[in-house]
């Protein structure tokens, strides 16, 4: 199973609540990159694919295209993982300028919500997953390093998300977006 994945260990791994390693990975023979999340078990070294973003966003994936000169389709460009609780993740997609919360990552992954541009996701079939913007602030664009932080001063169920905002929205695999 290990040889099935190309593992990019730069900043794209975290430890789960059992100290297993969750890693952003690319399937070795796939034509896509950085669109899978795998778990490496700490005791056995066994590798399990937890999340395949093509399974979660198939309609969006079908609208993307390989940029000229590219070797693989980096259609989401996931650049950070942050564990929310024992079974949820916050991921950052630079290619879509979207923050995505995934639930049930160990059994039946689903998208809980997304934070991104209404313009980017309108009529995509996924726009109902977007949280509503309730204040006047700049939306993130090409963000990196999204980090989940609990704070006991916040009401139950609320938390902070910190991120580095590149403030540059580029989507090379979705050329119709400008």
Task: Write out the residue ranges for each language-model feature.
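Beta-propeller blade signature
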Residues: 1, 33-46, 97-105, 174-178
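Conserved beta-propeller blade signature
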Residues: 22, 88-91, 160-164
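Signature of short aromatic-glycine-proline-rich micro-motifs recurring in repeat-based ectodomains
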Residues: 6-13, 65-82, 129-153
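Short, solvent-exposed loop/turn segments at conserved positions within beta-propeller repeat blades
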Residues: 29-33, 74, 94-95, 138-140, ...
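Loop-centered beta-sheet repeat module
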Residues: 72-116
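Surface-exposed loop and turn segments in beta-propeller and other repeat-based domains
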Residues: 1-6, 44-72, 108-138
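Loop/turn-rich, solvent-exposed surfaces of beta-rich toroidal or solenoidal domains
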Residues: 141-178
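Short loop/turn segments immediately following the C-termini of beta-strands
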Residues: 26-28, 52, 94, 166-168
């Amino acid at each position: 199973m290990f040889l099935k994945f190309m593992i990019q260990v730069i900043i794209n791994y975290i430890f789960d609540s059992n100290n297993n390693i969750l890693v952003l990975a690319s399937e070795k023979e796939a034509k896509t990159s950085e669109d899978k999340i795998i778990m490496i078990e700490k005791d056995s070294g066994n590798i399990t694919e937890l999340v395949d973003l093509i399974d979660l966003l198939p309609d969006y994936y079908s609208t993307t295209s390989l940029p000229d000169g590219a070797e693989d389709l980096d259609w989401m460009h996931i650049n950070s993982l942050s564990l929310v609780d024992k079974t949820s993740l916050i991921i950052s997609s630079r290619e879509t300028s979207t923050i995505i919360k995934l639930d049930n990552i160990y059994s039946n992954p689903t998208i809980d919500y997304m934070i991104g541009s209404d313009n980017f996701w309108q009529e995509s079939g996924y726009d109902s997953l977007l949280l509503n913007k309730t204040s006047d602030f700049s939306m993130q664009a090409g963000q990196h390093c999204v980090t989940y932080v609990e704070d006991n001063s916040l009401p139950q169920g609320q938390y902070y998300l910190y991120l580095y905002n590149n403030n540059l929205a580029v989507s090379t695999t979705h050329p119709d977006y400008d």
